[in-house]
């Protein structure tokens, strides 16, 4: 490719609203162009990188037995109604009507669509298992699109779905796809982790995320520094904590505690560890057609993890869509006083009460007395009937691993893949069944598997690039080599550059010849910005000594290559990087 023919509209400065370096570099280097909030055009350089990522993905998925299909981007809303996700997904789901008044959605995921296909064409256990996947455009109407391709509204995704006759077969495919995803991310040269994760709006019985470690990541993962335990903070667990030695022994009594509304101030007032303070967190629960209140109790030195709390409510059959902060007015309406809420008589005030599992058998506690400026001491939860316990706290870095009891540590990360065991949920709601070996009708066991293809462009750059511009990995750079002519007016240099260009093309090198009539410094700046893996300089030294200066983009390391061994050395460097 000749640079003079390449459509790569580089900018002098990155967009002013760009925060992440990946967004800055992709826009400034002419990879992407934004045409709306969270909506981007992929220009030739980006398309080359996308093609390389997609080719790797196709190769690995098909090696693991998956079949490539292409499904409609537009889906009947009635299918989403049947699955129950039309309301659950919320405003991120874009719903529209056609000219005849029929409701459709722009799909963020396609569980409903693929289940409809399976229900119509897979009739017997003999056709199972089957794993179908696609790479296609998706749309999620993000309330605050940001960070370029990291949180876009329109994006490219690889999504796959598998159908099975039993849970054992699903388990095997879950592990098979996990292996395929590991190979894909290894091929892309990424440093990643596989972590236990929340199922979210997709649902199912189990899921794992594939996350890239980067300080700008949106997510926090909790990782053991000793064993292989790793989980998204939304579901991370810890081992049971040891009780502090200075237990505040007291008979049940009510004490005046003026202006002590936080767990920390209560602990300080009574000269005890926050561990013994019962912290109450009241949330407004949003259902499809109503709002209720729920109270969650944790120890005073713990914080509520809202995803865990929402899941705990739904285990109780709450069908909650989301949790919101309860206002002072919400509390006043049910007769509660913020900062003094406790378990005594609470059931008449709120619809749901859940205690963190760390409070089981808890005694010697201090809790709100449900009266302004009063707390109760000597609270023993064993004296209450039918309390509901669940894991609802956010794990802290000081907590210990649930597997080996060693210290846990936070890492910032960016999710690039997610795999789920859906079990029979979608099959039952959409009535997708087959005949088993005994001729009996059974619902499919399902799995679903996704990789954010367009997000991977940002993930690679967040992990690999520097302040100068894009640094791509071995298998993702738009070009392996850019040939830079020091003085294009020197016909000998120009002729030699074209000769080297042809020599490298014949050896299968993906090469770009910068034949533009611009300053040498500008060409080198574009090399740093765009991120070809190597720059090969044709200049006076080349003519005088038959030597080329070669610069690696990853670390800007320079070396001299002899003309007689040029192709072999270039191939050797490209293979080793």
UniProtKB/Swiss-Prot annotation:
Q: What is known of its domains?
A: Consists of three domains: the N-terminal catalytic domain, the editing domain and the C-terminal anticodon-binding domain.
Q: Some GO term, biological process aspect, for this entry: which one? A: prolyl-tRNA aminoacylation
Source species of the chain: Helicobacter acinonychis (strain Sheeba)
GO MF annotation list: aminoacyl-tRNA deacylase activity; ATP binding; proline-tRNA ligase activity
Give the GO cellular component terms, alphabetically: cytosol
The catalytic activity of this protein is classed by the Enzyme Commission as 6.1.1.15
* Biological role stated in the UniProt entry: Catalyzes the attachment of proline to tRNA(Pro) in a two-step reaction: proline is first activated by ATP to form Pro-AMP and then transferred to the acceptor end of tRNA(Pro). As ProRS can inadvertently accommodate and process non-cognate amino acids such as alanine and cysteine, to avoid such errors it has two additional distinct editing activities against alanine. One activity is designated as 'pretransfer' editing and involves the tRNA(Pro)-independent hydrolysis of activated Ala-AMP.
Localization, UniProt:
Cytoplasm
User: Subunit comment for this entry?
Assistant: Homodimer.
Per its record, the protein catalyses: tRNA(Pro) + L-proline + ATP = L-prolyl-tRNA(Pro) + AMP + diphosphate
State the name under which the record lists this protein: Proline--tRNA ligase
